[in-house]
Regions:
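Phosphate-binding P-loop
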Residues: 2-14
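Short coil/turn segments at beta-strand junctions that form active-site/ligand-binding loops
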Residues: 12, 37-38, 85-87, 127-128
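Conserved P-loop
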Residues: 14-82
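Residue-level signal for inorganic ion chemistry
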Residues: 28, 59, 90, 134, ...
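Short, well-ordered beta-strand core segments
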Residues: 39, 89, 167-170
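Helix-adjacent hinge/juxtasegments
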Residues: 65-113
Length: 187
């Protein structure tokens, strides 16, 4: 039997990080549903094929219909600035945002800059903000240049978000573990 740890989200940014189908989105929806104010859901997915369209529909069905939906594949700071600062913001997901930026021919440096600007705007919000992203660095080294670039760029993006997040949770098999920082003293 597993233990239960209570994690209280403050008004800062929370990063939900984990593998595909790990329960990140379900956790975000649960947290959003318990928020007493308005919730804005920013979706970055693009329905490029029937399978992706089905996945998007399922995610839509899982969310409360009263939530405001923003569909923005290239989500940026100007979009975030237009959101009611008292509304909880859920971004699903950073993984697809980074993929979209790569396919929009953005350089690694431009994507790194995007991460710095977006993370600054997200932590400046008054209401809780949840950013969802995949951890893709735990598997094999991709066998092609694009795969390695994606893994590296997303890893850097996640690091920037995590460094500024009030809370970072790793989600696996529907369970969340809080990630902390370690202070090393070699002596």
């Amino acid at each position: 039997m597993g233990s239960t740890e209570s994690i209280r989200l403050g008004s800062g940014m929370t990063l939900l990080l984990g593998g595909a189908r790990s329960g990140k989105s379900d956790l975000a929806v649960s947290l959003g549903s318990s928020y007493s104010g308005d919730v804005v859901f920013a979706a970055t997915a693009v329905a490029g094929d029937d399978d992706m369209a089905d996945r998007i529909r399922k995610h839509q069905d899982d969310r409360p219909p009263e939530w405001e939906l923003i569909e923005e594949p290239l989500l940026d700071a100007s979009t975030i600035d237009r959101i009611d600062p008292s509304a909880m913001l859920i971004i699903d997901c950073i993984t697809l945002l980074v993929s979209n930026l790569i396919f929009a021919d953005k350089t690694n440096e431009q994507i790194d800059q995007h991460a710095s600007i977006l993370s600054h705007v997200l932590v400046s919000r008054r209401a809780p903000t949840i950013a969802i992203s995949n951890e893709v660095g735990l598997g094999l080294v991709p066998d092609n240049e694009l795969g390695r670039r994606f893994r590296d760029v997303l890893g850097r993006y996640n690091n920037r978000l995590s460094a500024r997040a009030e809370t970072a949770l790793f989600v696996a098999a529907g369970r969340a573990t809080q990630l902390g920082t370690v202070s090393l003293d070699i002596g």
